[in-house]
């Protein structure tokens, strides 16, 4: 038998994936179960069931049981020696809740290795479905959550986020009102991450220190459930009952929850000393896959844009999210989510290609990139010209809270004057650089105060900027990212593909079981992580003069957002 192995699971909306790594963090096996393609007997599409009438989106929990046996069978077929697996952790789609019935603990304890999980545990749930993050049925409950402590900013201050449809607190509130009898018969409530850990333990696992922050119920500064918010959420059964349902939350993200249940020992050949480590949320797991060091920034440039940062500063705002860091006490995960990302850039790319008569060109981004690189920062040919800036939202945006639309402005940093205009813009050419600048200025604006100076008299900025997703292949976008966000070490493209969450979970298991006393995740994984396998430097970061020019543009950008919000009569 060779060295120890560790498994990271990723239970996402459309699949369950398992990634097996060794102590050197090398991936040795991968097994996937695609819900639509591989499951039997569930009326799902893209992993979920949709009830349009009530804006509900949910998944059958039994589907996930079928998937877990399926993924483990896949690893068995590939020849994994399960006896070498020393630790297991996981990542779960955030915010989703699982409602266990009164027989849950007994059924988990009495699993028969000759039968499937689905056959034995389908009766373990008081409610057969788990709400998905795409669910938007809780507007009424969100309004109540936002108002309960005296406003969205107060809720964000306490729990790290204002109320969101997908967050577990508003979902539980709606659930206990819609199904009061089922709620009474619910013995425990798990998040998707702790549900996964529970299956391996053979009893219900506690919630994870980071994932619990996606509920609108956990007071981050106090490190405890917020009594007032529990009161709002609990309904007639009362606060103590809800506390029992949720259970205690251990502070250590690497705590040993216990050994694997004998079901897996007998059915697959796991060793009896295989340890279960808390599973975390998919976004927290992503920052572990890097590993993201304090003040590093990661920008996911997909259809939407997600910005993740590890920071020691807790500066909540209704437009952003803060979570406890999944492994490192004293750090937080900062997150921003935008609806308009790649789609908005593609609109302008297509308009440029149409105007140039090159719609069928083999590299659709070639013209967009060329124009972006040839255009001066903020469209200023000379310093006395006004700065061109705009907002480009083909779909309604959440940061800031605005309808779909386009707004263009000229800003004069010398006197602070701002004018909405369509004149002086050469459309769509001027919009290529303007949209990339607009997206990155918004990130810089909202992450102000979270970074420190890297030294040598440099202004506060990230150490590194990592780009992932489709947009990371684009050299022009990378160059502008470095000019606006800085990055004393540069801008890097990260190639983890779609394995980031499972990889982060596997690394978490390695750290939890191989750390020395007091050794942080960043230290242990940082020593073993071979960055040349995953990252490539694609652009310079901080450039003196350019970074400062964008600092001046930031004031105009903030004014522009506020003016458009005022015009549209919407508040953030």
Swiss-Prot record:
Domain of life: Eukaryota
UniProt keyword terms in alphabetical order: ATP-binding, Carbohydrate metabolism, Cytoplasm, Kinase, Nucleotide-binding, Transferase, Xylose metabolism
Catalytic activity: D-xylulose + ATP = D-xylulose 5-phosphate + ADP + H(+)
EC number(s) on file: 2.7.1.17
A GO BP annotation: D-xylose metabolic process
Record localization: Cytoplasm
GO-annotated molecular function: ATP binding; D-xylulokinase activity
Residues bound to ATP: 365, 470-471, 474
Induction: By D-xylose, L-arabinose or L-arabitol.
Cross-referenced Gene3D superfamilies: 3.30.420.40
UniProt family annotation: Belongs to the FGGY kinase family.
The protein's name in its UniProt record: Probable D-xylulose kinase A
Organism this protein belongs to: Aspergillus oryzae (strain ATCC 42149 / RIB 40)
